[in-house]
């Protein structure tokens, strides 16, 4: 056996060992064993509070993060309001949306939004879903949400629109919820290689490679919607060109630690 083959086998064995440990351990046990898991879960809790404070979610809405010690599972709160989520509320799921570790608490019904995107987009590690009212008119009218300023440059050439009627079974008259793996996959397919998708008559989903970045994108997509709506009342809107959007995204997303610091301090104040 060559040295390279031996190293590959050893690495694969280590990955399997980590995955086995993670699937057998509770979230708290994983936090005790893996510093990266502890950091991810604690940041996930903080993100729930920030999203609520910034009106990206309300009593409904949720955020997930991929397990840094096992990319085939993710963490998401049990079914409670984002503003009250604590570490002990975090559950672990596989990429089919099944709760792990024998956890029988009630999960979010739309956890398949997260499983669908995280399974199909290995570059995305965190997903947000919410129902911000500023975004809804775009999905209702077919008006494309496009970047109007540098903070929302990640919208690129415009956010795609998920039309659940095209995928709901057995009839197109669904309850509008992404409540099963097939609909989660359909939503992920609509998202494609982008980072933000609108859901007609429902809300939005955002993705990023980190919790901080997906929170940033959620908040500034909502702000973009408000600005774009106002600008459209005044006349022809000058959107960012594809080149401007690409350049602005690269620049602004190097600085997301700054608003994260602000938002964190705001939710930590008594």
What are these regions (language model features)?
Residues 1-7:
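N-terminal secretory signal peptides that target proteins for export/translocation
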Residues 24-270:
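Glycine-rich flexible loops
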Residues 9-20:
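Bacterial N-terminal signal peptides
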Residues 7-10, 115:
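Hydrophobic alpha-helical segments with strong N-terminal bias
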């Amino acid at each position: 056996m060559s040295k390279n083959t031996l190293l590959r086998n050893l690495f694969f064995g280590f990955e399997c060992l980590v995955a086995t440990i993670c699937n057998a351990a509770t979230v708290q046990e994983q936090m005790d064993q893996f510093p990266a898991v502890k950091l991810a879960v604690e940041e996930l809790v903080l993100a729930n509070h920030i999203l609520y404070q910034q009106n990206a979610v309300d009593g409904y809405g949720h955020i997930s993060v991929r397990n840094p010690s096992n990319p085939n599972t993710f963490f998401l709160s049990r079914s409670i309001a984002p503003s009250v989520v604590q570490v002990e509320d975090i559950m672990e799921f596989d990429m089919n949306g099944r709760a792990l570790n024998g956890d029988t608490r009630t999960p979010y019904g739309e956890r398949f939004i997260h499983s669908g995107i995280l399974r199909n987009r290995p570059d995305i590690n965190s997903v947000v879903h919410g129902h911000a009212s500023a975004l809804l008119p775009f999905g209702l009218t077919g008006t494309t949400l496009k970047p109007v300023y540098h903070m929302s440059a990640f919208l690129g050439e415009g956010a795609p629109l998920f039309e659940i009627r095209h995928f709901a079974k057995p009839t197109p008259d669904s309850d509008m919820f992404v409540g099963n793996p097939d609909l989660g996959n359909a939503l992920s397919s609509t998202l494609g290689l982008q980072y933000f998708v609108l859901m007609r008559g429902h809300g939005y989903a955002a993705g990023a490679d980190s919790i901080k970045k997906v929170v940033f994108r959620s908040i500034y997509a909502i702000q973009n919607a408000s600005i774009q709506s106002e600008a459209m009342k005044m006349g022809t809107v000058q959107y960012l060109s594809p080149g401007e959007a690409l350049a602005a995204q690269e620049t602004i997303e190097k600085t997301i630690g700054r608003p994260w610091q602000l938002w964190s301090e705001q939710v930590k104040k008594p």
